[in-house]
Amino acid sequence: MHLEIIYWKLNKDGISLDDLNMHIDKENILQWKKIKEIESKIWIENKNEGWWGAIIVWKNKKPPLSELPKNIPRAIIKRPPDIRLEFSIVDKI
């Protein structure tokens, strides 16, 4: 399994966490649930520091971007994430 952590520091963009959170709706979640390679996706925020992003656990390899739902947050923020980290999962409980 693989873990991907993606997040943006938003205080310089004029975009609120609420602006992004309103796009985590039933339709968006259903689109992500259709991705068979995904184990779980967790949307995260830090209101004090203005961080917003997601943690994704992939069962195997991440599929090509063309097979994933549209990246709505990136379209709203209009820039790549500040942090994108990828890890191999050694073990879990």
Task: Please state what every model-predicted region is.
Residues 72-80:
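A common structural junction motif
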Residues 1-52, 61-69, 81-93:
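Short S/T/G/P-rich N-terminal loop/turn motif that feeds into the first structured element of a domain
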